[in-house]
C-alpha cells in the first residue's frame, strides 16, 4: 500500500439534535394492463382457467414464445415473472427503473452516514468506537478474521473464542449469527490480495489534525480499509433492497406506477422504515433485504396458477439467507406462516400449495439448524412448532371436512388448534431440550399486557426501542398520507373478502363448498400487515417491519383488481400523481430533515479509556462493566470480557445480572465475591448508569429494587464506590465518564 501523508483539518460543523428517529366489476375480469397505459388498447381476459390477480403468464399447456439468445430468454422469464404485458422492452425498462431506485437509496444512506459521523476522516479507533453496543461486538469478529494469518485460522478463532465470555470458550458463529462477517471477511481478503497482485492501490491514508490540543491521527479512505469495506458492502446490499421494493410494488399492483409509489413512500417515511444509515452492522441490515425477496417470492407463488419448482427452491434459499444473519427472523417467519394458514383456512390457498410452502420452510429451518452447528433454539422455537402443527392439520383435512359444522365454526376449530397446538408443542420441546434462551421473549410480551416485571424484562422495556410505539408515529404516517392510502387499500381488500365470503360462512355442511377463491396474495398481504402492526405497536423497534410493508401495500392504490371501477372513470396516472404530489409535501420535509443532520463522531473519554487499557493492563486482564462498553473493550482493546450486548442467551443474562449488581444496593463484599467467581480483574464503573433513567422506575437502582426488594431503601453501591472504592476495590483510572476499579484479591 502506498501511504500518503498530509495535514487535513476537519470541518467541525455543529450537529443539531436529531429528531426521534357503482358496483365494481368482478375482480377476476378486471383488465390487468399497466395502470399508466390507460389510453392504449387492452386485451380482454382469456377464457378458461383464471389466474391470480394481475398475472398474465401462459395458461396451462401454452408455452411462452422462445426468444433468441440468452439475453432474450432472461428478458422473457422476467417478463412473465413481473406479470407485465408489453414485451421485452417493458421488462428491461422496469429493471432499469429498479436499478435507478437501488442507486438512489445507496447514495442516500451513504450520504446520511457520512454526514452524521464524518466517517471518512475518522481514525481506526474512532471508527471502531462509532460501532457502539451490538455493532461493535459483531464487527469485532470481522476484524478477527481479517487480521488472522489466514481465513481458516480466523474462522477457527471465532469458533473457539474465549475473549467474549471469559473464561468460557464459545462458538460465536453458532451463538451470534456471524455468517455475514465470515462472508465479508473472505471477500475483503480476496479483494485486497487481488488488488495487491495487480498493483492497484486500495486505500489512501492521511494525517488528520484534530485541533483542541489533541494529537493528530491517521485516517485511511478506500475499500482497502476494513471498516470502510464493511460499511460499503452493507450499504450496497440495502441499495439493492430498494430495487426489490420497486419490483415488489410493480408485481403486486400490476403496474410500474405501483413500484414508484412503493419507493417514494419508503423515501418519504425513511426514518420510520430503516435505521441502516445510523447502525450499519446490526443484524437487520444484512437480513431484512432477503425478507423482501422472500415475501416477493411468496407473492409470486400465491399468484401463480401452477407451482414452479424454481420458485419453491428460491423461496427456500431466501428463507435461509433471511434466517442465518438474524436470530429474530424466526419470529417474523412465524407471523408469515400464521398469515398463510389463515388465508388457507378461509379458502384462498389450496392444500397442495400451502403444503409445498410449509415443506420449503421446514427444509430451510433444517438447513439453518445444520449451518448454525445445531443451535437448538431453532428447533424449539414457536416457528418450528407452528410448522409441525400446520403440517399435521393439512394432513387431517379430510377429517375436518367430515365434521358437520358451519364454515365459521370450522375456521374457529382450526385456528384454536393451531394456536394451542403451537404453544403446547413449543413448551414440550423446550423442556425436552432444556432450552430457556428465548424465555425472556415470553416474559417481555407478558409484561406488555400484565404488570409482570423482572430484571431482564425491565432492561428491555426501559429502552425506548422496546417500549410501545410512540403516539406520534401514526401522526407521522398520516402527514405523509401513507396511513390514509394504506387504509383505503385495506378497505378494498376487506370489501373483496366480504363479497367472497357472503353465503359461505352460513353453510352447515363444510364439505359442500368446492370453490377456491382468487387473489389469495392480496388477503395474505392484508393479514401480514395486521401481524406487523401488532408487532410494531407492542415493540417500537419492530415498526421497521411495519412501515416498509405499508409502503408495499400503498402500491395497491394502482391495482386494477381493487380499483378498476375508479380507473374506468379517471385516468389512473392522474390519481396516482395527485396522491404522490400530496405525499411529497411532508415527505420532502422529512428528507430535508435527514439531510440537515451534520456532525462528527467524537468520544474522547472512551478513547482515553481504550488507550489506557491497551498500554496499562496485561493482554489477559479480564474486564466487566456495562454491555455497550464491553463491546468496545473487546473490539478495540482486545481484552477478555465476561459480558456483552448479545442478550439472547440465558447464561449471558445471568452473567450480566451479576455484573450489573454493582448498580444495586447490595453490600460491596457480596458483589466482589460474585465478580471474583467470574475471574474479573477490572470493573469499568460509569456513574451515569447509577443516576440516569429513561422514565420513572427505570434507573438501575430502581430496577434492582424490583429484583432485590430486601435491600430497597439502601444507598446504591455505585454511589458509594464513586466516592471511595476501598477496601474491596481500588481506583486505577478515572476520567469524566469512566472509573476503572481493580478487584482486590486479598
Curated annotation (Swiss-Prot):
The keyword Plastid does not apply. The chain crosses the membrane at residues 137-159, 227-247, 257-279, 307-325, 331-350, 357-374, 380-396, 405-425, 481-501, 520-540, 562-582. GO terms for biological process: protein C-linked glycosylation. GO terms for cellular component: endoplasmic reticulum membrane. Pathway: Protein modification; protein glycosylation. It is found in: Endoplasmic reticulum membrane. Its EC number is 2.4.1.-. Keywords: Endoplasmic reticulum, Glycosyltransferase, Membrane, Phosphoprotein, Transferase, Transmembrane, Transmembrane helix. Residues 59-68 have a biased composition (Low complexity). The keyword Glycosyltransferase applies. The modification Phosphoserine is found at residues 28, 31. It comes from the Eukaryota. It is a multi-pass membrane protein. GO terms for molecular function: mannosyltransferase activity. Residues 1-68 are annotated as: Disordered. It catalyses: L-tryptophyl-[protein] + a di-trans,poly-cis-dolichyl beta-D-mannosyl phosphate = C-alpha-D-mannosyl-L-tryptophyl-[protein] + a di-trans,poly-cis-dolichyl phosphate + H(+). Its main location: endoplasmic reticulum. C-mannosyltransferase that mediates the C-mannosylation tryptophan residues on target proteins. The reaction occurs on the luminal side of the endoplasmic reticulum and involves the transfer of a mannose unit from a dolichylphosphate mannose (Dol-P-Man) donor to an acceptor protein containing a WxxW consensus sequence. C-mannosylates the first two tryptophans in the WxxWxxWxxC sequence motif in thrombospondin (TSP) type-1 repeats of UNC5A. Regulates neurite extension during development. Belongs to the dpy-19 family. This is Protein C-mannosyl-transferase DPY19L1. It comes from Mus musculus (Mouse).
